[in-house]
């Protein structure tokens, strides 16, 4: 079945189905803004609305399409792989799992010998926080006001109230704490309690509007983490 230029699939029908079954808030917001885009054809760094309008995609889904939409090399690799393999089984090792893990860890500094796979950035953050808690046997997590690390279980708890409150993901009092960007004193005030498992920071806070950290701030946070036995998580997902 072809989805592009299919006369049986109309933009109006897709919008109705989206309102009825997918994300009514987001869909309605774009309709209200007179920007009810329904992505159809996509190639490289462009995509087309179902009504034929062509757009330059400078958002690239938050970096997902950094090699462009439907990159031919990626499509070829996926197609070739699917002729022999599928996702496998999470209980057993597999050829591609082992080969990819080896390749990833070969790019890391000495001592980083293992790779864990996840399906999204939020899952990766969850795994990082769980690993930090396991390694330090501490529970508290410090993040930056205005940050966004995902919408999964632990990742959403690091974010602003508008993300976590609707899902009752605030955690216990003091479990997830936010401090102001570039305020090393506020950061140290939390870390010196010596009960913080990890500090998680985006090098560039995209959802916050890309404020630039002060020179030396990130390095200063890393030094404070080392001083007080806290792990530093750089969220580059």
Describe each region flagged by the PLM.
Residues 55-58, 116-118, 143, 201, ...:
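General beta-strand structural signal in soluble alpha/beta enzymes
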Residues 2-43:
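Active-site-adjacent loop/helix segments that line or gate small-molecule/cofactor pockets in enzymes
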Residues 102-198:
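PLP-dependent aspartate aminotransferase-fold enzymes
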């Amino acid at each position: 079945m072809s989805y592009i230029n299919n006369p049986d699939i109309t933009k109006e029908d897709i919008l109705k189905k989206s309102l009825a079954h997918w994300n009514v808030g987001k869909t309605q917001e774009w309709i209200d803004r007179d920007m009810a885009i329904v992505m159809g054809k996509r190639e490289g760094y462009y995509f087309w609305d179902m009504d034929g309008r062509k757009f330059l995609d400078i958002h690239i889904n938050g970096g997902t399409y950094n090699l462009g939409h439907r990159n031919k090399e990626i499509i070829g690799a996926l197609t070739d792989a699917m002729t022999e393999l599928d996702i496998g089984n999470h209980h057993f090792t597999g050829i591609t799992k082992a080969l990819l893990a080896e390749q990833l860890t070969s790019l890391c500094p000495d001592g980083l010998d293992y790779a864990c796979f996840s399906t999204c950035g939020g899952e990766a953050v969850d795994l990082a926080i769980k690993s930090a808690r396991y390694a330090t046997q501490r529970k508290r997590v410090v993040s930056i006001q205005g940050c966004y690390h995902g919408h999964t279980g632990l990742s959403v708890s690091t974010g602003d109230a508008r993300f976590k409150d609707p899902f009752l993901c605030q955690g216990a009092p003091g479990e997830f704490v936010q401090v102001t960007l570039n305020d090393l004193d506020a950061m140290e005030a939390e870390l010196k309690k010596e009960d913080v498992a990890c500090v998680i920071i985006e090098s560039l806070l995209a959802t916050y509007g890309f404020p630039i950290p002060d020179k030396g701030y990130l390095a200063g946070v890393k030094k404070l983490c080392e001083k007080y036995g806290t792990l530093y998580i750089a969220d580059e997902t």
